[in-house]
Amino acid sequence: MSKSTAEIRQAFLDFFHSKGHQVVSSSSLVPNNDPTLLFTNAGMNQFKDVFLGLDKRNYSRATTSQRCVRAGGKHNDLENVGYTARHHTFFEMLGNFSFGDYFKHDAIQFAWELLTGENWFALPKERLWVTVYETDDEAYEIWEKEVGIPRERIIRIGDNKGAPYASDNFWQMGDTGPCGPCTEIFYDHGDHIWGGPPGSPEEDGDRYIEIWNIVFMQFNRQADGAMEPLPKPSVDTGMGLERIAAVLQHVNSNYDIDLFRTLIEAVAKVTGATDLGNKSLRVIADHIRSCAFLVADGVLPSNENRGYVLRRIIRRAVRHGNMLGAKETFFYKLVGPLIEVMGSAGEELKRQQAQVEQVLKTEEEQFARTLERGLALLDEELAKLQGDTLDGETAFRLYDTYGFPVDLTADVCRERNIKVDEAGFEAAMEEQRRRAREASGFGADYNAMIRVDSASEFKGYDHLELNGKVTALFVDGKAVEVINAGQEAVVVLDQTPFYAESGGQVGDKGELKGAGFTFAVDDTQKYGQAIGHLGKLSAGALKVGDAVQADVDEARRARIRLNHSATHLMHAALRQVLGTHVAQKGSLVSDKVLRFDFSHNEAMKPSEIREVEDLVNAQIRRNLPIETNIMDLDAAKAKGAMALFGEKYDERVRVLSMGDFSTELCGGTHASRTGDIGLFRIISESGTAAGIRRIEAVTGEGAMATVHAQSDRLNDIAHLLKGDSQNLGDKVRAVLERTRQLEKELQQLKDQAAAQESANLSSKAVDLNGVKLLVSELAGIEPKMLRTMVDDLKNQLGSTVIVLATVVEGKVSLIAGVSKDVTDRVKAGELIGMVAQQVGGKGGGRPDMAQAGGTDAAALPAALASVQGWVSAKLQ
């Protein structure tokens, strides 16, 4: 009996654990502090800083099963998903990594043992082919002489992409940085399937399938293209879980493995589909994986960047559900079946199930309102299409009006053998794409990053001043030996009391002092294992090796500590008041305010805000001890400690507990007891995105300042109302009631004035072929009164055409009215459009009533003068 996908995943991790590898959890699909990536798309992403020498781990061998998404490039990336055997938006990448430990020999031997060993995957050796980079004789000889693969099944691949080192078998992180040759392992499905071995003209067939890529990072590519050997070569490997599952389960398509079969059956159930071979079932089964895990990792549907990619995938899935005949929202119902089929890899998704389902349901409901109308419009356009290409403007209109991502339009067209004018679409939405490009900012020169070989020991939990030694200096990202007065720099010390920005807590400020110099620290940041003090040398000179006294701004740190501890209390209180679906989605802890973003689908009620505030203040009054313990990550999670969104954790973590009320993983600085916080006040609650709320709050002196400010405002209002704060409510209600009465009386007077003005105006109408024409600019009339006046005048004049205008604060307001018996010749919408165009505006409406605005008041007299000629022509 073949292994299940879950068993294959576990077997891979178990194998490498037995070879001394640390099993590391999958990182978030949103790369941590990496602007060069839209989504995590490979197992090595979370180790990038380790490979670059910017970070160090307490292990030199690692293995992972990494969740990945590849759907964020050009908009047609999605079109093959569901239609081919191996295209996915979401997949799991199995990988093993060596950070300066083993190299080619062990990497190849490990792979061969796992794939062919009787106790592991037990694949037939004669079915395996390998490729190596053309000049990588070392790897070639290991495969031939040590592993024993015949020469005819070892293929050298050269620079097949038109440039030096541009090869399927040479891997590069970017234009600069770590790179090296790779060897790939292929599985031969047999001669009953068309295709040829890699490097042959038939290599695109499905017979020979790549199952494992083993990268040997042995060079550092310079900006001029030179390849410098790395001092410690490393290994990065990747094997698609779905691909190896297809091989081990003896199927040719990834969609036929157990995981997808189960999901496809679930899709059929919720959509009512009966043909399990329908491609739309495969599309939806793939898309629920990427969408659910993206939402769980904090991505929300939007029109920019990651959120737009998510929106595209959701809407493509919904449209395929529509094709299957789904009559109601269905997509969110697949989260439960997905959690079941993912097993241990779906634990985080299970914790956030309610939130994920709500986000997907809301997005589907919003799109469902326009899907039918958009499809009808597309059908109309395709029915009258001359040729085989839909114009880009129509594709853009579908996107702009109906929310159709262009790949969804392309999907529909593809089914009818019609192409989409992509160039025209790109031109039509240039502004939107420009914003997305600016925000994504991909591509980086990795050699330009600050690289610190040394490590800094943080001692700020117990000290606010400390003597240390300068181990490195950087100016404009470049290492220097000395800095002089007036220069801005990054100073690295061997040990420091300064806290580097992390976990939402801002970096410390303060001073570094020594013999004849003073360095003002404006911020503190992490650079791998080093802590950098950013600031400016105000006096003297500072050089590498100098002794310094590091002094943290104590008062500022104290305020930060209170705010950070209050953030933990508020997080726990929110989960008690709103529910356990509340999860942190971001935070900022500064000396002035704390800001906390969390998952929740609606605005908090005033009573809920008060309840959270009261609950936090109750814990402050309890004066609970705030304690920290260092323990293994798994033990901390078993204890119930909550992990913070987007944070990376070592295997040994710091667990912060506040009595029995709150337990979280946290490396920040905190008060000693909850009573130190003094007072907690929420100053705002707002939404930042669909399903995400934000609270801002203050503590201690800041909270007291808000109390005093509120009291002062109340006293000022009481003074204005000639009362006191005790009877302020009654006074305000009386003023509001009097105001309502006066507004009512004022409106009555305005109505009377308008009626009188209408009566006066009716005498100014001129007769055009039996139709009364009235055109007038009115002074001192509010724009909203114009409609009432037109209605009155139509009743008085009978067959009539009316144009009225008024100017308020330089802005022109226009209205046109046409009696119903005249609308066959004069339409109010056309008339008002003609006038509005002359005053720099636009407008529209019904044939009998239309309104418009404009910005050019000086042009109004001429515009009104043109009405009589225009109407006369229409009445001929």
UniProtKB/Swiss-Prot annotation:
It catalyses: tRNA(Ala) + L-alanine + ATP = L-alanyl-tRNA(Ala) + AMP + diphosphate. This is Alanine--tRNA ligase. It comes from Salmonella choleraesuis (strain SC-B67). Its main location: cytoplasm. Homotetramer. Its EC number is 6.1.1.7. InterPro entries: aa-tRNA-synth_II/BPL/LPL (IPR045864), Ala-tRNA-lgiase_IIc (IPR002318), Ala-tRNA-ligase_IIc_anticod-bd (IPR018162), Ala-tRNA-synth_IIc_core (IPR018165), Ala-tRNA-synth_IIc_N (IPR018164), Ala-tRNA_ligase (IPR050058), Ala_tRNA_ligase_euk/bac (IPR023033), DHHA1_dom (IPR003156). GO terms for molecular function: alanine-tRNA ligase activity; aminoacyl-tRNA deacylase activity; ATP binding; tRNA binding; zinc ion binding. It comes from the Bacteria. Its cofactor is Zn(2+).
